[in-house]
Regions:
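Gly/Trp-centered helix-boundary motif
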Residues: 1-155, 159, 163, 289, ...
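Alpha-helical transmembrane segments of integral membrane proteins
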Residues: 125-345
């Protein structure tokens, strides 16, 4: 695929912003690693060699009786000392770097939970004896995936709504504007509290609920671009030739409107991550037990005598938001028309 000179120039401007460029690399590497969280932090071995046979517990479930007739035909608990002793007597196991999952309760702690950082638990444990590092890894992945999904879907809905408003104008635009004014005034948090009293919000339920309100963030920007673009000469020429409205909007106006829209996406993503963390902190987010950065912040607040909880939550969440903001600033500079050759100052 051949890139246009303008696109190549924008990429060069983005790369010239070292802070944003390296922030993108760091964020991409961290997120890429978190996608393989089960291979990094898990209470199941990566690989087992037992009695001449190979087992991959991280990918497949095995019953305990597969490792000896003395065990019951139930799911293998690899944290059980007896099972581990039996396996190691006739073979060996390879464990992940962090031998705990986000739900694992650490056994045989030397101090009551929350326990401080140690060689066994690098970031300590929370008030339920769960490894903090494991919950951070899974919580980071969950927060980014949730924020990314919410950002993409809400942006798509917002672009469509703004495009319809700006392109058709008139009564269509007026009705949309009045609806947005009324809908944006709805008490989102109170509605979420009511919803939480009826059902337990899961990942998708919470995502759909927030989508009902988050789509309005980009509508005004897209609407303004379509209001401007629909009166341009090449758009009028396309209409005169009988090109359908959908084709005109998709091929002739939307590419220009997306330039302004793309600069908002990193900031929208950071806002989505912050929103999920805030709801989890207040107790209105994901179900209890889910790996969440906001829940870790709440634990830090409730356990002031365990400062590692608050510090970990602060630095992880602050670091994620800082990286996204730096990326957003670099994207904004790259799409700034004043930075392109021939642009008037």
């Amino acid at each position: 695929m051949t890139l246009s000179p303008v696109t190549r120039r924008r990429i060069a401007i983005f790369q010239a912003n070292k802070r944003g460029f390296w922030s993108l690399w760091i964020f991409a590497v961290l997120f890429g690693l978190s996608l393989f969280a089960e291979f990094i932090a898990n209470d199941r071995p990566l690989l087992i060699r037992f009695d001449g046979h190979w087992y991959v517990p991280v990918l497949q479930d095995y019953s305990e009786d597969a490792f000896g007739a003395d065990f019951l035909p139930t799911g293998a608990d690899y944290t059980d000392p007896e099972l581990r002793k039996t396996i190691e007597a006739k073979g060996w196991m390879i464990w992940p770097l962090v031998p705990f999952s986000y739900t694992t309760s650490v056994k045989d702690l030397k101090v009551p939970s929350p326990a401080p950082p140690s060689w066994r638990n690098w970031l300590g444990t929370d008030d339920q004896a769960r490894d903090v590092l494991a919950r951070v890894i899974y919580g980071f992945r969950l927060s980014v995936l949730f924020g990314f999904t919410l950002t993409v879907v809400s942006s798509a809905v917002g672009v469509i709504a703004g495009a319809v408003q700006g392109y058709y104008g008139g009564m269509t635009d007026l009705l949309f504007q009045r609806f947005i004014e009324v809908w944006s005034g709805m008490p989102e948090l109170y509605l979420l509290i009511i919803l939480g009293s009826i059902i337990t919000p899961g990942f998708w339920v919470l995502l759909i609920f927030l989508l009902l309100f988050r789509w309005m963030s980009l509508t005004g920007v897209v609407r303004a671009e379509f209001l401007r673009g629909r009166n341009l000469d090449y758009v009028r020429a396309a209409k005169a030739l009988g090109v359908s409205d959908v084709i005109v909007m998709w091929r002739h106006i939307l590419p220009n409107a997306m330039v302004a829209t793309l600069t908002y996406l990193p900031f929208t993503l950071s806002g989505s991550v912050t929103l999920l963390s805030t709801l989890d902190f207040l107790g209105f987010g994901l179900p209890p037990g889910s790996p969440s950065l906001g829940e870790l912040v709440a634990q830090g607040k409730s356990n002031l005598t365990a400062p590692w909880l608050g510090f970990t939550a602060f630095f992880v969440l602050g670091g994620v938001l800082m990286l996204l903001i730096f990326i957003g600033e670099a994207v904004r500079d790259a799409f700034d028309p004043r930075r392109l050759p021939g642009a008037s100052s």
